[in-house]
Amino acid sequence: VCCLSLLVCGCEGKGESEELPFSPYVEAFTSGTISRYTPVYLIFNQEIAVDRMEPDQLRDLVKIKPETVGEFAFENNRTIVFKPSKSFERDTRYEVKADLSEWFDTERKDKYFSFRFSTQPLLLRANLQSVDINRKNENGYDIVCSVFTPDREIPETVESLVRFSEKANARWQHSPDGKRHEISISNIQAGTD
């Protein structure tokens, strides 16, 4: 009765794992697969001198590719954060490259530090929650399905991906975090087979 148009993710299986970058000045950084709405962090293992913390220079010293609208800022004297204006693109691999020589007395090999992260793809997973006999029609069923997404999605995006093989009166409820979407369909007629 209910037919979902699910997006299929093309998974690239790589035999070897990528080695994490190292810098004697870096304590932590964003890596792995993140939400499109998550800020990106670069955390140093020592403080940046106050006279070297010039917010206006951050755009020149730290680059993100592919280029993304947003803002780099000093969160404190050890942390740089990038917050996208709206969101990162779905299912995209990003690289951040920072010139550390403006903040630390680096050796030539440690002048630049770069790291990568990826964003979640648009995927749907549906679970049938319940099938009950309709109270007003013993030949009809009430069905409830939950649709889960790995990242926050707006209701219009999820609803546009779900199709029905028959005319149905569907009611949607979406969780505040945008990752759980519940659909209720009332009085689906029983099949004749």
List the predicted regions and their residue ranges.
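Bacterial N-terminal signal peptides
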Residues: 1-7
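Acidic, low-complexity Ser/Thr/Gly/Pro-rich repeat segments typical of extracellular/periplasmic
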Residues: 11-193
